Amino acid sequence: ICIKGPYSHNNLQIDDDREFAKMVRLCREAVGDEMTLMADVAYAWQDWKSAKRALDMCEKENLFFIETPLPIEDLEGLNKLSQSVQTRTATGEMLQTRYECFETIIRGNVDVIQPDVGRVGGLTEAKRVCDFAEDKGVLVVPHCWKSAIGIAASTHLSATTLACPYIEFLPNEL
């Protein structure tokens, strides 16, 4: 979901939680219940209670996950948010090592980890993150929108990971 158009990921901003909930509802109405709907909010909320308040407003829209709801260093907040909402929490695109990913899975209690093959140390390190996530019952949705090579690497990574239902990428044009 892109809050501000025309469908440019770089313009994503949430000015009002009610507007966010309305956008989620309108997207759900547009695509129907059969379509998987995810929302990347680009670290929109500064604390878990604010994120929870907004997510509670759109709970019935059945988001598959909410991506990057809080600053990546707020693992305690991610943990509390993950425990308090039905929507899966997802993060990891900015993490630099497998160890940061492991810590985010454990301390952040995330439902979906999103390693970026180009940032986390390549395919081998990303695969280690995937294996760890699978062992912990965490889904993997690799983050990638830099290049065709990165998308190909993420696609190959996802093919080796049972817990990987999707990859994230940003096409040149929407």
PLM region spans:
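Shared catalytic-loop signature of beta/alpha-barrel
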Residues: D56, N62, E73-L174
